[in-house]
């Protein structure tokens, strides 16, 4: 008898991706984050769908509609806090997933890596537009400041900003279009994630040793399907601890004040997951330069495959590059801290040093460390 999962056109696709997929026998918990990101995306799409049933994208009623969701809708407070903290969880998983890719040299799968970078940009755009929707003070001023950065683009800048705003300031038209984009983008992200997976399955997964694992493969199910279930359970436990006990820990208190164009908050800052990029933006005392640095802070990831000089793929047996990696991680924590501080000494100079270090490690120190390690292996 033929097994249905191996013959049915739809089941065959699922089978090749999640059941009979040959996987390396030694991939660690760091390889769980792909499935955890899928879980985060599902949580965000479902909670977002239910929120959109009660939300109104209008400047006069947006803030009240969010209050109505929290007060009057059955379990509305839960759905709202799941969605808000789900975004933070999404970025925690994203950054760990990218960190894993850098540490173990997964960026050598260029197509998978580049689609991952596109996915990161899409998720960042979605999160930014979602932050505008509750129409609190930080929503309004965050939208004003970040969209205004586009005016730094020579010649077309000011026209572009007015085109995005749909007027001469962030107003009803802006809120409306941001809601439309915020709704559609997660589905585009889901489609791109499938392409990401398609390219990954062309090459197969990398592993902690960074060596070919063709000689030692195991089926994805039951080994990694159960491992993913365990990872998902741990993620949900952590997620609901935050949602139910500390729902506002990661948010900004200013967003509980309705948007007021006549009153600027003392410190305009984005959500915590954008602070590192915001710090890099602010550390350059020139508008266009800052915008370029902001974009490059993410786009620099695309240079990882080009700047790989080592004869080994992963950092497992490369102590100098490992040191560089952990300095980079520490540097990102410093940038995140600086992004949340006011623009005054000593924070300005700390941010500038951390920004220079960020680009130096990736573009200069990593390649040099790789070459030194190659030499050391020959001694």
Curated annotation (Swiss-Prot):
Going by the UniProt record, its keywords in alphabetical order are: Electron transport, Heme, Iron, Membrane, Metal-binding, Mitochondrion, Mitochondrion inner membrane, Respiratory chain, Transmembrane, Transmembrane helix, Transport, Ubiquinone
N-terminal signal peptide: none
Q: Name one GO cellular component term.
A: respiratory chain complex III
| BP-aspect Gene Ontology terms | mitochondrial electron transport, ubiquinol to cytochrome c
Taking the first listed entry, what is the main subcellular location of this protein, grouped into a coarse class?
Answer: mitochondrion
Q: Where in the cell is it found?
A: Mitochondrion inner membrane
Classification via Pfam families: Cytochrom_B_C, Cytochrome_B
Source superkingdom: Eukaryota
**Required cofactor names:** heme b
Give me the segments passing through the membrane: 33-53, 77-98, 113-133, 178-198, 226-246, 288-308, 320-340, 347-367
Q: How is this protein positioned relative to the membrane?
A: Multi-pass membrane protein
Gene3D superfamilies found in the cross-reference section: Cytochrome Bc1 Complex, Chain C (1.20.810.10)
Which InterPro entries does UniProt cross-reference here? Cyt_b/b6_C, Cyt_b/b6_C_sf, Cyt_b/b6_N, Cytb/b6-like_sf, Cytochrome_b, Cytochrome_b_C_euk/bac, Cytochrome_b_N_euk/bac, Di-haem_cyt_TM
Q: Which residues bind heme b b562?
A: 83, 182
Q: Where does heme b b566 bind?
A: 97, 196
Q: What GO terms are given for molecular function?
A: metal ion binding; ubiquinol-cytochrome-c reductase activity
The residues listed in the UniProt record as binding a ubiquinone, with positions renumbered to this chain, are: 201
* Keyword Secreted set for record: no
Note how many cofactor molecules are bound and how: Binds 2 heme b groups non-covalently.
What the record says about family reads: Belongs to the cytochrome b family.
Mind telling me which PANTHER family this protein's record contains? CYTOCHROME B
Subunit description: The cytochrome bc1 complex contains 11 subunits: 3 respiratory subunits (MT-CYB, CYC1 and UQCRFS1), 2 core proteins (UQCRC1 and UQCRC2) and 6 low-molecular weight proteins (UQCRH/QCR6, UQCRB/QCR7, UQCRQ/QCR8, UQCR10/QCR9, UQCR11/QCR10 and a cleavage product of UQCRFS1). This cytochrome bc1 complex then forms a dimer.
* Function description: Component of the ubiquinol-cytochrome c reductase complex (complex III or cytochrome b-c1 complex) that is part of the mitochondrial respiratory chain. The b-c1 complex mediates electron transfer from ubiquinol to cytochrome c. Contributes to the generation of a proton gradient across the mitochondrial membrane that is then used for ATP synthesis.
User: In the UniProt entry for this protein, what further remark is given in the free-text comments?
Assistant: Heme 1 (or BL or b562) is low-potential and absorbs at about 562 nm, and heme 2 (or BH or b566) is high-potential and absorbs at about 566 nm.
Can you say what this protein is called? Cytochrome b
Gene transcribed to yield this protein: MT-CYB
